Amino acid sequence: MENNTELILISISGLDRPGLTACITETLSHYDVDILDIGQADIHSTLSLGILFKSKESNSGNVMKDLLFQASELGINLRFYPIKPEEYQAWVNMQGKNRYILTLLGRKLNAQQIAGATKILANQELNIDGIRRLTGRVPLDERKSSVRACIEFSVRGTPKNKEELQSELMQMGIQLGVDFSFQQDNMFRRMRRLICFDMDSTLIETEVIDELAIRAGVGDQVKEITLRAMRGEIDFKESFKERVALLKGLDVSVMREIAENLPITEGVERLMFVLKRYGYKIAILSGGFTYFGNYLKEKFGIDYVYANQLEIEDGKLTGRYTGEIVDGKRKAELLQLIAQVENVDIAQTIAVGDGANDLPMLSVAGLGIAFHAKPKVVANAQQSINTIGLDGVLYFLGFKDSYLEERGIL
């Protein structure tokens, strides 16, 4: 840096109104200073503005005098901080460091949750560069169930132990009732293109095979097989075959009735509308049945459905299936196959599910999200949503409510 120049940081605060930044920068322009960095935030009409500039040493006194006079006229607070060249250079050198985004999400957020998350970041020697609210302004009436709160932290640095960081965030989320996502802030985070959903207990608030079993009068037997599978006594494929066999003789009209009355998960309509509007490819990868997946495909304009095909003869289920069983391994393979067909990098993919057989696709996707999931799934997922509806996925993708309001989506 030239010997006859100075680096000065000014910090400005006060009641925000149009024209403040214009007035300050116009004063600086009279002295031909170079703006090296600038940042501004507005919280409840209170301005916080910072400007780092380089000025000729001979001009510094006059610059500061005029700025103080300007601040007095505007009724704002202004402070100066001289910056040493070596401090500035150290700051410049940090620009290549890893960057991450921590997203906190819930019906509402409190100080304890934010303190817990930021303490974990600090213990991992990560620095917060910026904070922004993604959701709209929070009404004081907490009885409104649709209220959501989401804050996004821009974080810089290299975690001391990323696995430990992830584990601590997960435990904090469970204990304090807050959802989180911790992602690397790179080009892929802003360019996701393919999203794959499990169906049962994810897009819909039920397990279809349980509904079918109840109608067939074999509900208890099917539940027992499911419990055996969860205990690890039989694998998914074997449990699937046994459960399907018990559905033999069920009339197809029952399937139609169930499909027409599927309980759609909170937030699905909003999520699907936004994803389609922004050009995402959407897939259902389910260990359930194609009949119901195709119903949702027509309802929401979903692009791909891969599930299990029940065999039907003379309008009744035979107790058999056709084709390959879609288990956890197959889901991961299908996600990669669709990405290849759509010419999408695997880092641009998202997977969302609730069960153990979703873990393979959650692991292989660029962004894997456990949704209202079983404890084992939450413990092994990188991100989870447990407090709000499925449209919470939008905040993990960086969408702001204001973006959607502008387009009449909210």
List where the protein language model places each region:
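A conserved regulatory-domain signal marking ACT and ACT-like small-molecule sensing domains
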Residues: M1-R192
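Short hydrophobic segments within beta-strands
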Residues: L105-R107, C196-D198, L285, V352
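Long, charged amphipathic helices and adjacent flexible linkers at domain junctions
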Residues: E87-G96, Q184-R193, T226-V252, K316, ...
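Active-site neighborhood of HAD-like aspartate-dependent phosphohydrolases
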Residues: M187-K237
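Short glycine/serine/threonine-rich phosphate/pyrophosphate-binding segments
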Residues: L20, Q113, L203-T206, D358-M361
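Solvent-exposed alpha-helical segments within well-ordered globular domains of core cellular machineries
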Residues: A22, E26, K65, F69, ...
